[in-house]
A protein has these predicted regions:
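Conserved Rossmann-like nucleotide-cofactor binding loop
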Residues: 12, 36, 159
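Glycine-rich FAD pyrophosphate-binding loop
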Residues: 21-41
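Short helix-loop capping/hinge motifs at secondary-structure junctions, enriched
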Residues: 187-194, 216
């Protein structure tokens, strides 16, 4: 039996572990630096039909309809003045069992996590070193914990410590002078927006998108991207917090 170590218990790490769940040829363990997985409500996520096709292989189609939403179109607007430009009918790309989907990120993480045995995820494991000895990989975590595996999958996010270790810090994210703002907006404050669609507003220095994340009458998800230049000190502090 081959041992697979997955670094990071985010969406990608949990999804990969689910793919190997019933394969008796592999023993999969996820190593997560945090002490638990955050299942707070959080923000929304959009999944293309290709994503849904992959997720359905591990039972995503069994998720209750009330916990997800299938938008009909993307409505494009200008920010100033607020005026609709056009729309794109994304439902044209849907099939019976693969539909463009929006939902809360926490709901997707919960679905992926609940399909795995509790002992698959090892918390409070912060990767520090990766070494190779013949055909085996030796991983050193905090508290001098060592793990030996046959295959290593690194999926610990954009500010990946695992990738930095492998590349000797040669791989670093590039800041493009933009920041993301996330939140929720009450549906009663959406004025004339079509609640069945994704609304995308485009401005010179600020784009934002609003969309529902389930079929309940809850607040819609909001995410905006704003042009904003962080100082070198602010950027260093931000990266350190995420590592």
């Amino acid at each position: 039996m081959k041992k697979i170590a997955i670094i990071g218990a985010g969406i990608s790490g949990l999804f990969i572990a689910n793919l190997f769940r019933d394969n008796q040829d592999y023993q999969v363990t996820i190593y997560e630096k945090n002490t638990s997985i955050d299942l707070d409500e959080g923000y929304g996520i959009q999944l293309s039909t290709n994503s849904i096709k992959l997720l359905n292989k591990i039972g995503f189609n069994t998720l209750e309809n009330k916990d997800k939403f299938h938008p009909d179109k993307i409505d494009f607007y200008t920010v100033k003045p607020e005026k609709k430009i056009c729309d794109l009918n994304i439902s044209d790309f849907n099939s019976f069992d693969c539909k463009y989907t929006t939902l809360k990120r926490s709901k997707l993480v919960e679905f992926l996590k609940d399909r795995l045995e509790d002992n698959i995820i090892k918390y409070d494991h912060d990767i520090e070193k990766i070494e190779k000895d013949n055909n085996q990989i030796i991983i050193t975590f905090n508290k001098s914990i060592k793990v030996i595996c046959d295959h290593l999958i690194i999926s610990d996010g954009v500010f990946s410590k695992g990738k930095s270790i492998i590349s000797n810090n040669e791989i670093k994210p590039v800041y493009n002078n933009s920041i993301a703002i996330r939140g929720n907006i009450s549906r009663k404050n959406l004025n004339s927006l079509n609640e069945k669609n994704i609304s995308l507003f485009m401005g010179s220095n600020f784009h934002y998108v609003i969309y529902p994340t389930n079929n309940d009458n809850e607040a819609s998800n909001f995410i905006g991207v704003l042009k904003y230049k962080l100082t070198a000190n602010e950027l260093d502090n931000y990266i350190l917090k995420l590592q």
